[in-house]
Amino acid sequence: MGRYRGPRLRIIRRLGDLPLFTKKKPHIASKRLPLGHPVRKIKRRPSIYGLRLLAKQRCCYSYGLRDYQLKNYIKKARNAQGDPIKNLIFLLESRLDSKIYRSGIVSTMAAARQLITHGHVLVDNIKITIPSYSCNESQILDYKNTKLTSELIEKIKLSFNPIYVLEYYAIKL
């Protein structure tokens, strides 16, 4: 079993906006029911189980995880010292595909996974092809010198705006 490869807009309509999953947005007209379908009834308030299930599904689809992978990350987060939720976020954000996505080279987590599995990413000058590889802060991420990666890096250089960086750090302080 691999990651989800089905229709993405169907998931977006069900779970809401998932920026890590895809950049696609559903059309406003697609919210209507097709002809011949009965009118929707009033939705009931979701149960606690339903809310937790939605949160789990949003997390799984956002980071491209399967249920057992998320379960293992939750176990690790609970066993570590400190707040389990912060530990879980730290574990998910320390994955290699998440680091590549946050660097701004690619637009979605799936594109980051593809870049890694095709062998374009080096960690401490070693080719890593596993998207779930856990990175430390001290490790150096690099890209193979190919036409694809050089085009991606040029695109980032053109879209870089230092004013946004200054605003970000001014708000954080």
From Swiss-Prot:
Q: Which Pfam families match?
A: Ribosomal_S4, S4
Membrane-spanning residues: none
Compartment list: Plastid
Query: Which Gene3D superfamilies does this one have?
Result: Ribosomal Protein S4 Delta 41, Chain A, domain 1, RNA-binding S4 domain
According to the entry, every stretch annotated as the S4 RNA-binding domain falls at 94-155
Show the GO MF annotations: rRNA binding; structural constituent of ribosome
Q: Which PROSITE patterns match?
A: RIBOSOMAL_S4, S4
Q: Which UniProt keywords apply?
A: Plastid, Ribonucleoprotein, Ribosomal protein, RNA-binding, rRNA-binding
**What GO CC terms are in its UniProt record?**
plastid; small ribosomal subunit
Q: Which GO terms describe its biological process?
A: ribosomal small subunit biogenesis
**In which family does this protein belong, per the annotation?**
Belongs to the universal ribosomal protein uS4 family.
Subunit structure comment from the entry: Part of the 30S ribosomal subunit. Contacts protein S5. The interaction surface between S4 and S5 is involved in control of translational fidelity.
Q: What does this protein do?
A: One of the primary rRNA binding proteins, it binds directly to 16S rRNA where it nucleates assembly of the body of the 30S subunit.
What name appears for this protein in its UniProt entry?
Small ribosomal subunit protein uS4c
Record gene name: rps4
